[in-house]
Amino acid sequence: MNMKTLIIFYHPYDGSYCKAILKAVQEGLKRGGHPHKTINLLRDAFDPVMHEKDLQAFAVYGRTGDITQSDVDPLVLHYKKKLEWAERIVMIFPIWWMTMPAMMKGFIDKVIFPGVAYNMDGPQLVSRLHSLKQVTIISTMNTPADVYRDRFNNSLEGSLVKGTFNQIGIHDVEWISINMVKQSGQEKREIWLEELEEKFAK
């Protein structure tokens, strides 16, 4: 079954392993006949900073129920349309200091936002992304998996899987953590890329 897939990508270095992952995922989706679009936050010059006018958009949404009536970042509205189109999201980024980079966190802050990605129904958060069925998070890091789990409590799982997507009612969330990237040889890296391409070709 084909799935309309939105890739959300961030890494500042064009020669990064994350960029190789992006290409593998795109190739797999192409082979599998899955319609797909890519948000490249750096290429889009996305501003991750939450400015006063961005917070004011929350108040406007509270009064009107329409985020588009506020002075919201135009890129946010552009991303909103892509999110509404998607049946699956694939996020690709590195782990820095045990969490996602500021650019990706800014995307969560400004785009997974009331009136954009969810509505507030009393204490409940209700997804507005009615087509979205699945989220896959692919992260890279140089920390061993057991250290990230035992010492840092898989912090990304708490903040992004449970604290963001699960909270707005999206529970089919898969996190693929690729660990010890710098310490791994070229052969191992190629195997990871082949596995990812095959996964998204299905």
Enumerate the language-model features and the residues they cover.
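N-terminal beta1-alpha1-beta2 submodule of the flavodoxin-like/Rossmannoid cofactor-binding fold
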Residues: 1-116, 183-202
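A structural micro-motif
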Residues: 3, 34, 133, 170-171
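Conserved beta-strand scaffold positions in the cores of enzyme catalytic domains, especially
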Residues: 7, 36-40, 137, 172-177
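Short, histidine-centered active-site or binding-site loop motifs used for metal coordination
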Residues: 9-11, 139-142, 177-180
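Glycine-rich phosphate/pyrophosphate-binding loop and the adjoining helix
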Residues: 32, 147-202
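Structured loop/turn residues at beta-strand edges in well-structured enzyme cores
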Residues: 84, 102, 130-133, 171
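Short, structured loop/turn "capping" segments at alpha-beta junctions
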Residues: 114, 118, 170-173
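Short, glycine-/small-residue-rich phosphate/pyrophosphate-handling segment
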Residues: 119-166
